[in-house]
C-alpha cells in the first residue's frame, strides 16, 4: 500500500511503500533519506492533527512531515536551515515572424505561414511547460495549507483540552479562595467555639484513642471540643495560613495571566489561519489550463490555415488575395493574441510562484507561533497540575478540621446511638424469635407424643431419648462494647449548645440534617411499609423484614400518618366524583333537548330547565327524570345526523380552502411580478440618482476649488495689508531700546524692505495666477457652452440609439425565445449575449452527440442485422434438422412398436419354452432318462431365450435414447424461438430510437440553417460539399423586409415568422429519407441512410460555430459601444434637466411648463393666447391676480389644461346648457353650466381649443402699454416674421402647404367657409394618436386653420402634432426629457421681441429635428451591418 508523505515547508509530496516499513523510526529514516531533514528533527502528524503512531496493519494514507528546526526562532549566532523560496520566472515572448520575400508568390506565403506555425508551436510548448510549473506551484500550496491545517488542528485539540481543565480549576479556585480566606480569618473564632462547647469525656477518649493514664494526669474538668484538637499544630497552621493564602492567590493570578495570554494567542492564530485560507491563491487554480487551451486553439487555427495554404498551387489573383487576407488576420489578431496570452501565462506563473513563496514564509511563521503557543500550553498545564498538589494546602486542611470538629463529634455521637439502638432491636427480635420457636417446638413435641401413643406404637422402633424434635438456638456474636454509651438527649444537648454559641449556619444545618437522618427507616423497612400496592400484598417484601418492623413505635406512627393522608385523599376524590356526577347529570338532562321539546319556544325551555334544577333537589324527581332516559336513542340518531352534516360542511370547507390557496398563489405570483417590475424601476431610478450625485459632487468639488483659490487670494491680500502694520507695532514696542539697538533697527529695516519687495513679487504672481484662473474659467465656460451644444446633438442621437438598442435587444430576445422558449430571458444584455452563445454551443454539442449516437446506432443496427441473419440461418438449419429428427422419430416409433410386438411374441414363446423346460426338468427329476434329442432341444431353447433377452434390452435402450434426443431438440427449439422473439423486440426498440434520433438530428440541422438565415447569413456549398457562410447583402435584406414597408423593426420579422420549434419535420420534402430504417430491402435502407447522412453532414459545425461566435461578438461589441454612448448621453441630459424646467415652452404644452402669454387681435373678448409654434388655440383663463389690462405680456406656469370643442348647435336647441370638455391630465369629459363658457372667445363651430389655467411665475411686465404700441400691431409684425421664416425654411413652397394648399389668409377664409357638419367630421377636430404617419401635415394645416392664432409662427418641419390626447399630456419623465432636450427656448427678459424670438425658435427647431433622423440612419446602418435585418 502506498502512503503519501507531505512535506510542510517545501510542499513536496513523496510516496512510500508502507509494506516495507515496520516502525515509526523506519518511516523517519525513509523520509530523511529522500529529504534534507535529519531524523531527530522530523515531526510526523496525521491528517486529523494527532501525533503519528505507526501501525503496520492499518497504515495512514497521508502523513504530514515538519522540520523542527524551522519551527523555532533562530538564536543569534546559530545557523538556521535555508528557507524554501523559489526564484521568480521571467518569460519573454519572441516577436512573431512577419517578413516575406515576395508577396506575389504562393511559396513565399507558404514559407511565412510555416515559420508562423513553428513559432506558434514553440509558444505552445513554452506555455505547456509554464502551465505544468504553475500547477506544480498550486499543488505545493495545497500541500502547505493541508499541513498547516493539521498543525493548527493539533494545537486546537491541545488548547481545547487545556481549556476544559482550566475552566474546572477556575471554578474550584474561586470557591477555594473564599473557603481558605474564611478559614484563615475565622481561626480564633473556631477555637473559642470549640473551647466553649462541652462534650462527653468517654466519647472524647474514644475519638482521640487516649488511654485513661493520659487523662488521669490532668485536673478533673468538663471535656470540650478543644480536647479533640492538637493545639500546637493548630496554632502553627493558623500562623502559616495568611502566607499560604497569599501564595495560593499569586499562583492562581499567574495562572490566569498565562492561560489568558495562551488562549488569546491561540484565537489570534486561528483567525489569521482562517484569513490565510480565505485569501488563498488556490481559487485561481485552473486558469492556466484554460489559457493554455485558448493558446492551443489559436495555434490550431494557424496550423489549419497553413494546411489550407499548402493546397494552393497557382499564384492567381484570387488565391493571393485570400492568402493575404488570412495572413493579415494572423498579423492583426491571432499572433498578437497568442503573444499576449503567452505573456499572461508567464504572469500567471510568476503570480503562482510569488503566492507559493509568500505562503511558505507564512507557514513557517505559523509553525513558529504554534511552537511558542504549544510551549506556553505545557507551562500552563504544569501549573494547573501543580496547583492542587502543593504542601501549603495541608495548612488549610488542619484549619478545615478545626472548623468541622463540631460536625465530626456529632457524627460520632449519632453513629454510637444508631449502633446501640440497632443492637437493642436485634436482641429483642432474637428473644421474641426464640420464644416463638420454643412454642412451636413444644407443640410439635406434644403432637408427636399423641401420635405415638395412638398409632406409632404398633409398628416401628420404640422411642428413644435421641428421637427429639429439632431445636433452634440463637447466639449473638461480637459486641460493640468499645463504643461509649450515648443517648439522643446527649446529641440534642450538644446541638442546642452549638446553636446557643452561634456557630456557622452551614454547620448547624448539616448537624440538623444528620439528626433528622437518624429517624429515617432503612430500605428493608421501607419496603415492608410499602408492601401493600395496587390492591395486593407483596408477601416477599412482607416476610423479609417482618421481624425488624414488629414493635417499632416510630414505624407505627409513620404508618398511621400514611393512613390519615390516604383517607383525606380518598375523601377528596369521592367528593370530586360526586360533583362530577352531578354536573354530568345536569348536562345530560338540562343542556340536551329531548324529543318532546325540540320545537318549544325559549320560555318553555327555561321553565323546563327550572323544573330540572328543582328536580335535582328532590330525590323522587331524580328517579322520575332517570326514567326519561329512554329517549336517548332518538337523540343519538339526531347526533349522528348532525355529525354527518358536520362532515359535509368540513369537506366543503376543505374545497373552499383549496380555492383560497389557489387564489393566494395567484396573488403571490402577481405580487412577485409587480415587485420585480418595481425593483427594476427602482434600480433605474437609483442609477439616475447615482449619476446625478456624481455630477453634483464634481460640480461641488470645482466650486470648492474656486472658493479655495479666492480665499487664498484674499488671505494673501490681507497679509500684504497687515504686513506693514505688524512691523510698525513691533517698532513701537522697541522704541525704549532704540539707543541700544540702532544697528539692529537698520538691519530690520533693510530686511523689511526686502520682504516688501518679495511681497510685491508675490502679489504680482498671485494677480497673474488670478488672471490665468479667470481666463481658465472663461475657457471652461466656452467649453461648457460647446458641451451643451454637443449634449443637444448627442441627446438626439441618444434617442435614435435607444430606439435601435431596444429593437435589437428585442431581436436578441426573439432569438433567445427561439433557442430556449422554456427559459426566462436574461435582463442584462451581456448575460443575454452569453446565453445565446451558450445555447448555440449547446445546440452544436447536441448535434455532435446526436451524430455520434447515430453512428453508434448504425453500428448496432448492422450488428443486429448480422445477428438476425445468423439466427435466421440457424433457425432454418434447426427447422430442417428438427424435421429430419421428427421423421426419424416416427420411423423409430414404428420400429419400436414392431419390436414391442416381437418382444411380446418372444415373451410368449419364452414362457412356453420355460413351461416345456420345466416339464422336462420334472420328467428328469422323476427319473426318466431322456434322449440326446431332448437335451439338444433344451440347449437350443435356452440359447434362443438368451438372444431374445439381449435383443429386447437393446431395443429398449435405443428407444430410450431416441426419446431423450427428441426432448433435447424440443428444448433447443423453444430456446431458439425465445431468443428470436427477444432479438425482434430489441430490434424494434432500436429502430424506434434510430427514428427519433434521425428526426431530432434533421430538425436540429434545419433549425441551425434557419437560424443562420435569420442572423443575416447565406449558406453556399461547392461541388465537393464544402460549406461557406457569407453575409447576406443589404439589398437582399431589404427585399426580405418588403412584406411590410412600414415595419422597420428587425424583431418584428422574427415575430412574424414561425419559431424555430414550430416547424414540423413532416413539412419537409425529404420526408422519405427520415424513414430510412423502414425500407423494404436492406439495399434500399443502406442507400437511403447514406443519402441522409450526406445531407446531415453538409452542415459544417466548425464554420457554423465560428460564424455565430463572430456575430455574437460583433453584436456584443456594438452593444457595449451603444451602452457607453447611452450612458454618456444620459449623463449629459441629466445635467440639463433642471435648466429645461425653467425655460419657456412653445410647443407640446403640459402642466408645469412655463409659457409666454400675449394678447390676441380679438381684444373685445379679452383673449390671451400662449406663444406657440405649431400648437395654436391655447387660451389663458383670466384671473384677478393676472391684471391683464395693465400688461403687454405674461409669463406664467401652466397648472391645468382643458380641451374643448366648439358646438354651436347646442345654443339653438336650448335643451341643456353645457358642453363636453376633456381634462388634459385624465382624459375625462365634463359639462359646462352656461353658454358663455362654451365659446367665450367667439370661435367658429367645430374648432378644438384649449383653456389654460396658469399662475404667474416671473413678474416684471410693464404695467401699461408703451407709447404708440398696441398688441394688435405686435401680433401683425410677428405674423409677418413667421411667414418670412417659413419661406426661408421651405424655399420652394412659398405660402402654400403640401399639395398647393394656401397657408395664409386665404387658407383661413377657405377653412372658415366649410360647412358645420364637415368641420365637425374633419381630422382637425378628431383626436389622433401622436407620432402617426402624416401627423406633421395635419399639424401644419391645423396650425394655420384658425382665426385665433395671433402668433402666426410657421411650424417647423417635424413629425409631431398637438397633444390631442391624455396619453401625450401624461408623458413619462424620459419622454419629457427627450422633448425638452430637442427644444431651445429663449430666456425671458424684461423686454421681449416676438419677431426675433420666433425666427430663432423656428430655426433651432428645424435644426433639432433634422439632426436625429440623420443620426438614426447612421446608427441603423451600422447595426444592420452587424446583426442583419
Curated annotation (Swiss-Prot):
Q: Which GO terms describe its molecular function?
A: molecular adaptor activity; protein kinase binding
- Just give the chief location class: membrane
Keywords, comma-separated and alphabetical: Autophagy, Coiled coil, Membrane, Protein transport, Transport, Vacuole
Low complexity biased stretches: 80-89, 1042-1061
Keyword Ligase: yes or no? no
* Skewed-composition ranges (Acidic residues): 1230-1239
- A Pfam family found in this protein is ATG11
One GO cellular component this record assigns the protein to is: vacuolar membrane
> What residue spans carry the Polar residues bias annotation?
1345-1372, 1383-1393
Q: Where is the composition biased (Basic and acidic residues)?
A: 1209-1229
Q: Does the keyword Ligase apply?
A: no
Gene Ontology biological process terms, A to Z: autophagosome assembly; autophagy of mitochondrion; pexophagy; piecemeal microautophagy of the nucleus; protein transport; reticulophagy; ribophagy
* Region span, Disordered: 71-99, 1024-1061, 1209-1241, 1336-1429
The chain's coiled-coil residues are 143-173, 553-590, 632-815, 851-989, 1105-1143
User: Where is this protein localized, as stated in its record?
Assistant: Preautophagosomal structure membrane; Vacuole membrane
Membrane topology label: Peripheral membrane protein
Function comment: Involved in cytoplasm to vacuole transport (Cvt), pexophagy, mitophagy and nucleophagy. Recruits mitochondria for their selective degradation via autophagy (mitophagy) during starvation. Works as scaffold proteins that recruit ATG proteins to the pre-autophagosome (PAS), the site of vesicle/autophagosome formation. Required for the Cvt vesicles completion.
Q: What does the similarity note say?
A: Belongs to the ATG11 family.
Provide the assembly information. Homodimer.
Record-given protein name: Autophagy-related protein 11
Amino acid at each position: 500500500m502506498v502512503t503519501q508523505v507531505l512535506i510542510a515547508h517545501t510542499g513536496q509530496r513523496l510516496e512510500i511503500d508502507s509494506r516495507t516499513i515496520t516502525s515509526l523510526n523506519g518511516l523517519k529514516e525513509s523520509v530523511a533519506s529522500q529529504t534534507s531533514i535529519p531524523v531527530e528533527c522530523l515531526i510526523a502528524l496525521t491528517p486529523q492533527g494527532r501525533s503519528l503512531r505507526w501501525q503496520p496493519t492499518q497504515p495512514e494514507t497521508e502523513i504530514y512531515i515538519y522540520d523542527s528546526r524551522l519551527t523555532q526562532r533562530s538564536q543569534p549566532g546559530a545557523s538556521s536551515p535555508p528557507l524554501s523560496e523559489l526564484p521568480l520566472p521571467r518569460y519573454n515572448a519572441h516577436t512573431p515572424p512577419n517578413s516575406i520575400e515576395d508577396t506575389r508568390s504562393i511559396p513565399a506565403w507558404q514559407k511565412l505561414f510555416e515559420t508562423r506555425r513553428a513559432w506558434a508551436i514553440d509558444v505552445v510548448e513554452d506555455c505547456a511547460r509554464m502551465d505544468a510549473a504553475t500547477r506544480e506551484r498550486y499543488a505545493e500550496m495545497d500541500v502547505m495549507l493541508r499541513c498547516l491545517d493539521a498543525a493548527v488542528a493539533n494545537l486546537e485539540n491541545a488548547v481545547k483540552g487545556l481549556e476544559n481543565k482550566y475552566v474546572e480549576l477556575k471554578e474550584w479556585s474561586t470557591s477555594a479562595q473564599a473557603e481558605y480566606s474564611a478559614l484563615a480569618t475565622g481561626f480564633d473564632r473556631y477555637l473559642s467555639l470549640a473551647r466553649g462547647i462541652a462534650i462527653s469525656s468517654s466519647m472524647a477518649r474514644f475519638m482521640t484513642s487516649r488511654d485513661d493514664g493520659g487523662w488521669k494526669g490532668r485536673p478533673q474538668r468538663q471535656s470540650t471540643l478543644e480536647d479533640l484538637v492538637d493545639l500546637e499544630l493548630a496554632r502553627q497552621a493558623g500562623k502559616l495560613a495568611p502566607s499560604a493564602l497569599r501564595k495560593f492567590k499569586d499562583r492562581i493570578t499567574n495562572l490566569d495571566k498565562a492561560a489568558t495570554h495562551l488562549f488569546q494567542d491561540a484565537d489570534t492564530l486561528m483567525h489569521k489561519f482562517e484569513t490565510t485560507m480565505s485569501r488563498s491563491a488556490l481559487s485561481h487554480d485552473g486558469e492556466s489550463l484554460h489559457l493554455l487551451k485558448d493558446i492551443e486553439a489559436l495555434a490550431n487555427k494557424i496550423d489549419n490555415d497553413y494546411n489550407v495554404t499548402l493546397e494552393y498551387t497557382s499564384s492567381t489573383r484570387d488565391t493571393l488575395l485570400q492568402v493575404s487576407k488570412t495572413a493579415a488576420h494572423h498579423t492583426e489578431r491571432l499572433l498578437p493574441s497568442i503573444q499576449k496570452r503567452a505573456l499572461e501565462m508567464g504572469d500567471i506563473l510568476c503570480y503562482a510562484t510569488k503566492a507559493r513563496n509568500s505562503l511558505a514564509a507564512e507557514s513557517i511563521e505559523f509553525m513558529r507561533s504554534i511552537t511558542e503557543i504549544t510551549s506556553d500550553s505545557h507551562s500552563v498545564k504544569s501549573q494547573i497540575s501543580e496547583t492542587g498538589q502543593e504542601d501549603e494546602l495541608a495548612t488549610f486542611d488542619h484549619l478545615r478540621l478545626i472548623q468541622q470538629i463540631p460536625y465530626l463529634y456529632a457524627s460520632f455521637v449519632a453513629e454510637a446511638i444508631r449502633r446501640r439502638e440497632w443492637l437493642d432491636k436485634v436482641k429483642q427480635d432474637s428473644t421474641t424469635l426464640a420464644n416463638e420457636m420454643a412454642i412451636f417446638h413444644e407443640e410439635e413435641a406434644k403432637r408427636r407424643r399423641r401420635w405415638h401413643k395412638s398409632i406409632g406404637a404398633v409398628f416401628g422402633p420404640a422411642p428413644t431419648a435421641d428421637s427429639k424434635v429439632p431445636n433452634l438456638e440463637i447466639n449473638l456474636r461480637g459486641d460493640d462494647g468499645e463504643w461509649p454509651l450515648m443517648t439522643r438527649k446527649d446529641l440534642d444537648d450538644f446541638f442546642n449548645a452549638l446553636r446557643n454559641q452561634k456557630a456557622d449556619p452551614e454547620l448547624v444545618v448539616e448537624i440538623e440534617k444528620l439528626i433528622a437522618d437518624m429517624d429515617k427507616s432503612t430500605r428493608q423497612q421501607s419496603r415492608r411499609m410499602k408492601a401493600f400496592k395496587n390492591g395486593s400484598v407483596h408477601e416477599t417484601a412482607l416476610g423479609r423484614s417482618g421481624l425488624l418492623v414488629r414493635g417499632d413505635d416510630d414505624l407505627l406512627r409513620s404508618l398511621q400518618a400514611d393512613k390519615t393522608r390516604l383517607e383525606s385523599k380518598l375523601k377528596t376524590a369521592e367528593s370530586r366524583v360526586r360533583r362530577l356526577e352531578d354536573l354530568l347529570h345536569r348536562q345530560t338532562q338540562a343542556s340536551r333537548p329531548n324529543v318532546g321539546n325540540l320545537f318549544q319556544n325559549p320560555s318553555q325551555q327555561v321553565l323546563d330547565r327550572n323544573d330540572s334544577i328543582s328536580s335535582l333537589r328532590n330525590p323522587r324527581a331524580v328517579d322520575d327524570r332517570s326514567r326519561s332516559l329512554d329517549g336517548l336513542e332518538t337523540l343519538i340518531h339526531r347526533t349522528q345526523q348532525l355529525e354527518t352534516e358536520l362532515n359535509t360542511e368540513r369537506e366543503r370547507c376543505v374545497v373552499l380552502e383549496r380555492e383560497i390557496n389557489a387564489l393566494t398563489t395567484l396573488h403571490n405570483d402577481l405580487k412577485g411580478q409587480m415587485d420585480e417590475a418595481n425593483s427594476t424601476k427602482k434600480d433605474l431610478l437609483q442609477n439616475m440618482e447615482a449619476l446625478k450625485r456624481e455630477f453634483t459632487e464634481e460640480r461641488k468639488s470645482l466650486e470648492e476649488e474656486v472658493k479655495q483659490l479666492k480665499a487664498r487670494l484674499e488671505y494673501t491680500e490681507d497679509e500684504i495689508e497687515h504686513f506693514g502694520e505688524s512691523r510698525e507695532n513691533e517698532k513701537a514696542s522697541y522704541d525704549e531700546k532704540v539707543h541700544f539697538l540702532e544697528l539692529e533697527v537698520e538691519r530690520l529695516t533693510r530686511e523689511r524692505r526686502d520682504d516688501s519687495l518679495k511681497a510685491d513679487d508675490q502679489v504680482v504672481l498671485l494677480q497673474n495666477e488670478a488672471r490665468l484662473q479667470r481666463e481658465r474659467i472663461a475657457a471652461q465656460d466656452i467649453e461648457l457652452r460647446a458641451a451643451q451644444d454637443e449634449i443637444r446633438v448627442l441627446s438626439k442621437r441618444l434617442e435614435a440609439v435607444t430606439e435601435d438598442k431596444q429593437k435589437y435587444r428585442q431581436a436578441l430576445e426573439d432569438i433567445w425565445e427561439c433557442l430556449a422558449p422554456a427559459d426566462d430571458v436574461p435582463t442584462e444584455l451581456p448575460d443575454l449575449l452569453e446565453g445565446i452563445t451558450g445555447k448555440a454551443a449547446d445546440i452544436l454539442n447536441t448535434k455532435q452527440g446526436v451524430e455520434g449516437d447515430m453512428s453508434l446506432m448504425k453500428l448496432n443496427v448492422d450488428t443486429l442485422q448480422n445477428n438476425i441473419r445468423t439466427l435466421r440461418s440457424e433457425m432454418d438449419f434447426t427447422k430442417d434438422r428438427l424435421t429430419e429428427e421428427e421423421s426419424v422419430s416416427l420411423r423409430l416409433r414404428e420400429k419400436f412398436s414392431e419390436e414391442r410386438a416381437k418382444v411380446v411374441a418372444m415373451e410368449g414363446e419364452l414362457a412356453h419354452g420355460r413351461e416345456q423346460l420345466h416339464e422336462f426338468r420334472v420328467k428328469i427329476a422323476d427319473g426318466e432318462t431322456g434322449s440326446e434329442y431332448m437335451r439338444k432341444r433344451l440347449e437350443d431353447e435356452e440359447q434362443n431365450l438368451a438372444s431374445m433377452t439381449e435383443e429386447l434390452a437393446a431395443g429398449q435402450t435405443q428407444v430410450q435414447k431416441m426419446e431423450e434426443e427428441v426432448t433435447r431438440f424440443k428444448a433447443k427449439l423453444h430456446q431458439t424461438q425465445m431468443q428470436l422473439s427477444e432479438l425482434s423486440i430489441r430490434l424494434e426498440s432500436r429502430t424506434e430510437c434510430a427514428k427519433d434520433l434521425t428526426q431530432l438530428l434533421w430538425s436540429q440541422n434545419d433549425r441551425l440553417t434557419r437560424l443562420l438565415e435569420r442572423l443575416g447569413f447565406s449558406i453556399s456549398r461547392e461541388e465537393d460539399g464544402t460549406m461557406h457562410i457569407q453575409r447576406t447583402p443589404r439589398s437582399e435584406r431589404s427585399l426580405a423586409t418588403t412584406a411590410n414597408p412600414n415595419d422597420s423593426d428587425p424583431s418584428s420579422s422574427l415575430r412574424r415568422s414561425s419559431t424555430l420549434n414550430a416547424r414540423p419535420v413532416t413539412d419537409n420534402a425529404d420526408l422519405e429519407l427520415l424513414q430510412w430504417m423502414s425500407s423494404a430491402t436492406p439495399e434500399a435502407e443502406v442507400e437511403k441512410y447514406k443519402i441522409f447522412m450526406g445531407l446531415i453532414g453538409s452542415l459544417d459545425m466548425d464554420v457554423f460555430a465560428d460564424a455565430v461566435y463572430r456575430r455574437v461578438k460583433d453584436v456584443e461589441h456594438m452593444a457595449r459601444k451603444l451602452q457607453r454612448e447611452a450612458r454618456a448621453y444620459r449623463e449629459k441630459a441629466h445635467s440639463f434637466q433642471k435648466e429645461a424646467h425653467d425655460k419657456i415652452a412653445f410647443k407640446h404644452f403640459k402642466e408645469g411648463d412655463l409659457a409666454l402669454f400675449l394678447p390676441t387681435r380679438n381684444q373685445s373678448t379679452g383673449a390671451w393666447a400662449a406663444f406657440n409654434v405649431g400648437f395654436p388655440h391655447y387660451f389663458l383663463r383670466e384671473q384677478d391676480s393676472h391684471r391683464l389690462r395693465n400688461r403687454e405680456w405674461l409669463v406664467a406656469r401652466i397648472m391645468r389644461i382643458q380641451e374643448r370643442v366648439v358646438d354651436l348647435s347646442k345654443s339653438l336647441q336650448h335643451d341643456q346648457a353645457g358642453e363636453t370638455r376633456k381634462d388634459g391630465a385624465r382624459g375625462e369629459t365634463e359639462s359646462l353650466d352656461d353658454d358663455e363658457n362654451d365659446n367665450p372667445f367667439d370661435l367658429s363651430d367645430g374648432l378644438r381649443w384649449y383653456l389654460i389655467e396658469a399662475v404667474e411665475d416671473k413678474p416684471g411686465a410693464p404695467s401699461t402699454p408703451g407709447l404708440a404700441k398696441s398688441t394688435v400691431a405686435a401680433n401683425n409684425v410677428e405674423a409677418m416674421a413667421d411667414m418670412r421664416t417659413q419661406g426661408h425654411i421651405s424655399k420652394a413652397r412659398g405660402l402654400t402647404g403640401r399639395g398647393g394648399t394656401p397657408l395664409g389668409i386665404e387658407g383661413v377664409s377657405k377653412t372658415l367657409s366649410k360647412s358645420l357638419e364637415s368641420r365637425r367630421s374633419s381630422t382637425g377636430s378628431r383626436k389622433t394618436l401622436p407620432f402617426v404617419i402624416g401627423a406633421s401635415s395635419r399639424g401644419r394645416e391645423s396650425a394655420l386653420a384658425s382665426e385665433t392664432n395671433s402668433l402666426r409662427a410657421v411650424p417647423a418641419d417635424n413629425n409631431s402634432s398637438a397633444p390631442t390626447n391624455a396619453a401625450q399630456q401624461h408623458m413619462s419623465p424620459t419622454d419629457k426629457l427627450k422633448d425638452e432636450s430637442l427644444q431651445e427656448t429663449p430666456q425671458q427678459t424684461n423686454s421681449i421681441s416676438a419677431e426675433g424670438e420666433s425666427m430663432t425658435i423656428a430655426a433651432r427647431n428645424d435644426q433639432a429635428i433634422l439632426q436625429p433622423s440623420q443620426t438614426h440612419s447612421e446608427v441603423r446602418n451600422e447595426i444592420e451591418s452587424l446583426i442583419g435585418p
